[in-house]
Amino acid sequence: MVVGQRERKRRCIRGEPLMNDTTWVLDGGRLIDPANGIDRIARLVLHEGKVHSIDTPDGDVPPDAGRLDVTGKIVAPGLVDLATELREPGSEEDETIQTGSNAALAGGYTTVLCCSSTKPLMDSAASVQLVRQIAQRVDGVRVLPIACLSKGRQAEQMAELGILAAAGAAGFSDTPRPMPNDALLKRALDYCRMFDLPIFDRPEVPELADGGVMHDGQIGLILGLKGLPTEAEDLAVARDVRLAEATKGRLHVGPVSTMGSIDMIGRVKSRGIHISASVCPHNLFGSDELLRSYDSRYKVHPPMRSPSHVEALRNAVAEGVIDAIESGHMPRAQEKKANDLDLAPFGASALETTLAAIATDLVETKILPWSRAIECLSTAPARIAGVKGGTLSVGANADVTVIDPLNAWSVEAKEFRSRCHSSPMTGRTLTARVTHTLVGGRLKFELHPTVASAAS
């Protein structure tokens, strides 16, 4: 049964589902499903949590079905994020699974892979199960834990990967830390082939990056801030691609931010080596020039690089060298970010702005068509992670994102659903906004003219 506007607002405040209809009809929208090569005006019918049909005649639609008029909007598979920090348990001052889920839904995400930035770390079956249990209680976005690759995230001993996989881990990583132990990474890549689960590596050589604040370039020299050299990333990527080639394991490298990384990844892909890579939105729009303000909201990781790197990254996304775009959501409490640039932590809130930033910086500028943008934000991440999603195929989970491509809005971080209100996008006018997010056929987010609402 469809509920009224006042009841929707009440449910939003209480964190309850907005709608419970078992059947939804989305009429008049531009259906974009890169997995099936679909990009046309079509009717989409969802039933009992699954994609039921496309272009169903009126006579075959139940009369009591919930209906959404999405004329002029884009209907896409729900977005999938490869690396989201939700910070719970242990750092709830930064983010909780509830607030992070609300932010994800408002950004069009239906599935997020949750990094092990928790306390306790996700290096035991109990800690993985705890995150899954909290996420189930929240009942918002789908949360898939990425367990630690090494015990205690110390890069000394391999974690008990088999036990973690059995507990529900969707993959393994020491993110946000890199993996400096070459031998451990090689063993893990070999071992994970038994589970067919991916390993995610954040490429960086710690000894070269230690103490760095921003891109190691002319701007950093002028500002007197220690740099994060491109070589720190390039050398790690070189190691990663060689190990991926040697082991044939499932290795994802990202986020990347340098021309050197792109060059190496492109060359190994041309030889048929299976490796995937991702990039963050902040590396596709802003350069290190923004750090002249000494504003800690621009202290993100990977750091904003010089304009030549930004241009190369954009081209790499367009050409398919970079497979996916991840949000880079690393929430940190305002009292932590409100510090001198060299003392403030890396991090930013990004789930609510990623799609709009890509639409503004890559689609509006004709670098990407909408189909490629959706592929990078949904289809490719689902494929890389090996999870259900990223498609509107009949029988697939009814995870759907509806986008108004012409909705221009000003980013005000204080209005974020995330607990973190630090964002490099603050003050920008972005084009395109999510209007509806459905997870498993349930309407979890709806943007109203007078109130923006996210439901669990």
Curated annotation (Swiss-Prot):
Keywords for this protein: Hydrolase, Pyrimidine biosynthesis
Superkingdom classification of source: Bacteria
Record CDD domains: DHOase_IIa
UniProt keyword Hydrolase present: yes
Signal peptide range in chain numbering: none
NCBIfam families referenced in this protein's UniProt entry, alphabetically: pyrC_multi (TIGR00857)
Protein name from the UniProt record: Putative dihydroorotase
Natural source organism: Rhodopirellula baltica (strain DSM 10527 / NCIMB 13988 / SH1)
